[in-house]
Amino acid sequence: IQTFFLLDVIACVSPIGIFLGRIANFINAELVGKVSNVPWSVIFPMTDSLPRHPSQLYEAILEGLVLFLILNLIFFKKNYKIGTCSYIFLIGYGTFRIISEFFREPDAHLGYFFNILSMGTLLSIFMVITGLIIAKFFYKKHV
């Protein structure tokens, strides 16, 4: 079995685990969002009793459901090329994570780097760059 085919299969099912993990984070009031006044704000028990973005649900939708749909639509296309889902996963997950980090409190012990980037954002930037490098490799290989 080819390595990138196996990685593609793993990439296509990983969003299911990410979705379930983020739902568990929401239920357990973990990784809470930033304080907010939007109508769908949530007050989590055993926190500071302030209304917050349900950032775990944003992540469940983007990194879980949306990414799952994108990857599986690509994987089951007639002209699917091995490796495509691998780099799309890295680019997609990284991008969706960067977006969702704007609504999420940074880890208390880490805070922000350069007063703007959370650790999640920083790592996601590297993930997107890695995905783009792999995409360039596959593009050169198939052209």
Describe the predicted segments one by one.
Residues 1-143:
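A feature for loop-to-transmembrane-helix boundaries and adjacent hydrophobic helices
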